[in-house]
Structure formats: structure tokens, C-alpha cells
């Protein structure tokens, strides 16, 4: 059975369910069930050292002609990856506190009672955070990453691997290490009602986080592992200055979680702090028609539109798309006169901020 399973798993990674069934005459046959709503389609069968796309035709299986295989791939790609279903992941895998926080306090809209499963599933399907499958409602990739309590259970690549090194190269003797995982967004204090009727206080960047998500945890890791210099100004005021502008660091982290290629499994985002620089490395090349030159100019394009939309609601992402030129490039120039490196290298994208 294991050998058979290995012969039908596509290299992209589907996970057939193995079982058995008793038929007439007391014979037992092996049953292999392929998930109908897997992330990576079409399925392939192994023939020798090659993988062959096959389709069902009535009660038989046949090889798909090149044109049909191309059509199957095209149909799979039409749906953005962050809107695809995650088999096995459901409503119970979400942090209900964050969901209420998002719809009630961030979006300022009514939401179902916490125990109203059907109401929540319908709302989340309507907002693409869940997907209706053939047999059940499942989380979308974006829904799991944004609000999932343990996204790595289903998506091993859902996290940030952070390390702080004493020198300018990677070292086994790191000063600090942390695997950062959980929901991308923080849990924020509920919005307060204004003293003036019909004028609620809207969610903003100044809203207080009461439980950090991945983005804030990553920024906290940076704060703990860089220095802050303090001095007394001529007018007697205490002045402070971090090694790096935190707004630029935050923008680099947000861009990584919003735009990385989540189809590349297992590989986390890398956040590395060296003696002379900070590096944020995102798996995957730049999305769509984006180039480094276009990024510097503020070109707007996204690989994970659902994730970006929700992060924009939380004010993590600028609606103008000018986060890179304004916060990273201009921010580093103003801070220490350095020019940040934006590098597309093989199957990864690197943002490098220099200490100066």
C-alpha cells in the first residue's frame, strides 16, 4: 500500500488516504481515496521515473493529452492560492476572538454569535476565508494563515524563522532563535464608542494589541535583539534612537508575509539579525510582473490578494502601495543615509537593511 501511495502522490504533494474494504468471497482490497479539494491539482501517477497526469473516463483511467493537461493546470491556477481550500481545516481551527475582533471592531460590521457555526461559516465563505467543498466547508489558505490558531499543522511553511547572530554571518552559536507561528494578525482591544452619538471610534494603527500575532511577534524579536541609543539633548530632553527605523523593519516583515509564495512548502520566511544588517528573506520570486525597479517606484501587485486585503483592513498595508519607497527606502535614508538592498535571487526575495 505504501508503495502504491508513493506512485500516485504528485511531487507537488497530495495526501491520499489509505484503507481497505472487504468484498465478495471474503477478499480484502486496498482502497486509496484522493481528496477532492486538495490544494495541488491535477493529480499524477508515477510511471517509471516520470509523473503522468491521468483523468477518469467512466470506469477507466486514461492519460490526459497535453492540451487537456494544460487546461487542468490552468483551471487550478485561476483561483489564487490564498483562496484555495485547506483539506481538513475547519472552523474549529480558527481563533474566534480574532474573528469577532476583525468583523466587529476592524470592519465595523455585525457578526454572528460565537456559537452560531452555520452563521459563521456562511460569513467566512462570503469573505473567502472559508471555501465550500464537496462534503464540508473548509478554511482557505488565507483564512488559516490570518486567523488560524495552529496554521503549521496544515501548512508547514506558515511561519517565520528568526535568528540573531553575533557576527556578520550565520553561526550555530546564535544570540537568539525563535520559530514564530500562529495567526498573522494580532488580537486588539475592542473599539471604544465615542462620547458623541453615531460617531464610533474606528480601528487605527494606534489600537492596542493585547495578544501579538506573527507580525508583531517578529517585530518584538527585532526590538529585543537590536540596540537603542539614548542621550540628553541640549534642551534637557531624553532622546532615543534604534539601530534601525522600526517602521522600515515592520514594512519588510509585512511584505514578506503578504507576498511570499506559499506554494513553496516547508520553507519559512527568514528573519536574520547580524552585527551590521537585518535580512528578511521570502520564499519565491516576485509575483506577477513585479520587478525590483517597479517595487522601488511603488508598483502595486499582489500574489496573495486576500491576505493583503485583510492586512490593509488592519492598517498593516498601505492602500497606496508606497510602503517600500516611503517606509523602507526613504526611511533608511533618513535614519542613517544607507540604501536598502532589494534582491531577487533564484527562488527567494531578500530585503537587506544596513545598520550604518
Residue ranges of model-derived segments:
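Conserved glycine-centered short motifs in functionally critical loops
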Residues: 265-291, 298-310, 314, 322, ...
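Divalent-cation
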Residues: 1-51, 56-59
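Short, surface-exposed charged micro-motifs
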Residues: 20, 161, 268-270, 339-341
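Glycine-rich ATP-binding loops of the HATPase_c
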Residues: 318, 337-343
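Active-site helix-to-loop segments that bind/position phosphate- or nucleotide-bearing substrates
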Residues: 54-266, 289, 293-300, 315, ...
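Short C-terminal beta-strand
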Residues: 347-355
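A short glycine-rich, hydrophobically flanked beta-strand micro-motif that places a catalytic Asp/Glu
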Residues: 16-19, 255, 264-272
